Swiss-Prot record:
Protein's UniProt name: tRNA modification GTPase MnmE
One cellular component term from this protein's GO annotations in UniProt: cytosol
Binding, Mg(2+): 234, 255
Pfam families with a match to the protein in the record: MMR_HSR1 (PF01926), MnmE_helical (PF12631), TrmE_N (PF10396)
Organism of derivation: Aromatoleum aromaticum (strain DSM 19018 / LMG 30748 / EbN1)
Top-level EC class: hydrolase
Length: 451
């Protein structure tokens, strides 16, 4: 079970807005008994949940800035502790002065994710919801952001709690019967235990598939464009991105370094990487670009092998194909079909899918977008998906393995009950009901400072 919240008497403070200049900057403070802290900082008594225009003053009462003071007494705050927010002007110098004054008054700088960690430890949110805070901040598409909001509101956690409740109910029945070994078989039949177990398995499979879709929304996939020089890799990147991000010329070898662009296809972030043309070259700069291309290929989820449709695959293309890593999805692109009379098409060949298109005229590019979604395994609707992380997928897969194992142990209730217990623990790790301090440290250390 989750450990009781430790005593956290210290006060933490941090900038809650991004570094740089802006119209407004926010300093957030959390801790115990912050009313005297607010009085020392503003010279006035803070009123709970009331926006007060005031001066923020230094140790001798000299104004540092003026702005809005918000005071949220415990437990009705984000962290469950007293929280104050100081909303002032968004200049980096003045914000640092306000933050320094907070430190003078006894606060310390918050660690990354410490506000969210305190919210979790004080029961204001579970671990999946806390992770959704970071995912919402980092969301790169509208669909991903909306899915993160659903996770933050507890939709994903509610599913985990329903699965946990079903496992607990079944465990209670099993363990209550362990004192009567002669009735094991009758119990399983009369309590419809296997029926209940099968229902849990079906629910787990559905949740796992939705989590896979959510993980795809969160992380997207890396797509690397490879091919010989001047086959239209940069033109294809620009076409997909809708912008001239890569230099396009008739001179072979123009792209010397990887050019990255993230595009959204039905809300899925697709990280497209245009690379240097793969060929033998004496140019040391171009040769360095080719070496970087191979490093990008090693990290690819999908490789788009670009070929000039006017001439088809060349001997150099065979060498490239032979050197590509095994197990990585490949799509062959016949580009420049507008120059040779071919029509846009998706063709299934023995060695994989071929897309005929013209990047220059944007003909057939929708076929490529659809193929990328198919390869990614995306078949959900954004409104049904909640964001998930790799650790969620691992926990759900493990829980499913234990549920399946329990089905095979229906003749031995002790083993049956143990598999149910292990499945419950794995699901509980998602919401933080069962979590080690090491896991919490890793998760919250990846948050930004002010959350």
């Amino acid at each position: 079970m989750r450990s009781p919240a430790p005593s956290l008497p210290d006060i933490i403070a941090a900038l809650a807005t991004a570094p740089g200049r802006g119209g407004i900057g926010v300093v957030r403070v959390s801790g115990a008994a912050l009313a005297p802290f607010a009085r020392a900082l503003t010279g006035r008594e803070p009123k709970p949940r009331h926006a007060a225009f005031t001066h923020f003053v230094d140790a001798v009462g000299k104004p540092i800035d003026e702005g809005i003071l918000l005071y949220f007494p415990a437990p009705h705050s984000f962290t469950g502790e007293d929280v104050i927010e100081l909303q002032g002007h968004g200049g980096p110098v003045v914000l640092q002065l306000v933050l320094a004054r907070c430190l003078e008054l006894g606060a310390r700088l918050a660690e990354p994710g410490e506000f969210s960690r305190r919210a979790f430890l004080n029961g204001k949110m579970d671990l999946a919801q806390a992770e959704a805070v970071a995912d919402l901040i980092e969301a790169s598409t509208v669909v991903a952001a909306r899915s993160a909001v659903r996770s933050l509101s507890g939709v994903f956690s509610d599913e985990m709690h329903r699965l946990t409740d079903a496992l607990i109910d079944l465990r209670m029945l099993v363990e209550a019967t362990l004192d009567f070994p002669d009735e094991d078989v009758e119990f399983l039949e009369n309590a419809r235990a296997l029926e209940r177990l099968d229902a849990i398995r079906v629910k787990l499979e559905r949740v796992l598939e939705r989590a896979r879709q959510g993980a795809l929304l969160r992380s997207g996939m890396n797509v690397v464009l490879v091919g010989q020089p001047n086959v239209g890799k940069s033109s294809l990147l620009n076409c997909l991105a809708g912008d001239e991000r890569a230099i396009v010329t008739d001179i072979a070898g123009t792209t010397r370094d990887a050019v990255r662009e993230t595009i959204a296809i039905e809300g899925i972030p697709i990280h497209v990487i245009d690379t240097a043309g793969l060929r033998e070259t004496a140019d040391p700069v171009e040769r360095l670009g080719v070496e970087r291309t191979w490093r990008e290929i090693a990290r690819a989820d999908v490789i788009l092998r670009i070929v000039d449709a006017r001439v088809g695959p060349q001997p150099g293309d065979d060498a490239i194909d032979a050197a590509l890593p095994e197990g990585v999805e490949r799509i062959t692109i016949f580009n420049k079909i507008d120059l040779c009379g071919l029509e846009p098409a998706r063709l299934q060949h023995d060695d994989g899918v071929v897309i005929q298109l013209s990047a220059q005229l944007a003909l057939g590019v929708d076929l490529l977008r659809s193929e990328l979604l198919r390869v990614a395994g995306w078949h959900a609707h954004g409104d049904d998906v909640v964001l998930a992380r790799e650790r969620h997928l691992v926990a759900l897969r493990d829980a499913l393995t234990h549920v399946v194992a329990a089905r095979s142990q229906c003749g031995a209730l002790e083993l049956f009950a143990e598999e149910l217990r292990l499945a419950q623990i794995r699901i509980g790790e998602i919401t933080g009901e069962f979590s080690s301090d090491d896991l919490l440290g890793v998760i919250f250390s990846r948050f930004c400072i002010g959350k």
